[in-house]
Amino acid sequence: MATVIRLTRLGRKKKPFYRMVVTDSRKRRDGGWVEAIGYYNPLAETPVVKFDAERLKYWVSVGAKMSDRVATLTASK
């Protein structure tokens, strides 16, 4: 299974909220996922990014690839 770490969209119309998840690369954006490791709220006064750094490091060590957006969001932490 080729795993990737990416964002799935939650929230309602025009009010996005994203969950950072580990999933199979062949699944749809909002399809099933293996593990949720954090979230991203771009609409807060200061955008909020929270994630479990240990789990992120674990998944990258076993071969999961990060999407461009996840790599950008996690690089600042």
UniProtKB/Swiss-Prot annotation:
GO terms for biological process: translation. Disulfide bonds: none annotated. GO terms for molecular function: structural constituent of ribosome. The keyword Cell cycle does not apply. Pfam families: Ribosomal_S16. Keywords: Ribonucleoprotein, Ribosomal protein. GO terms for cellular component: cytoplasm; small ribosomal subunit. Belongs to the bacterial ribosomal protein bS16 family. This is Small ribosomal subunit protein bS16. The lineage of its organism: Bacteria, Pseudomonadati, Campylobacterota, Epsilonproteobacteria, Campylobacterales.
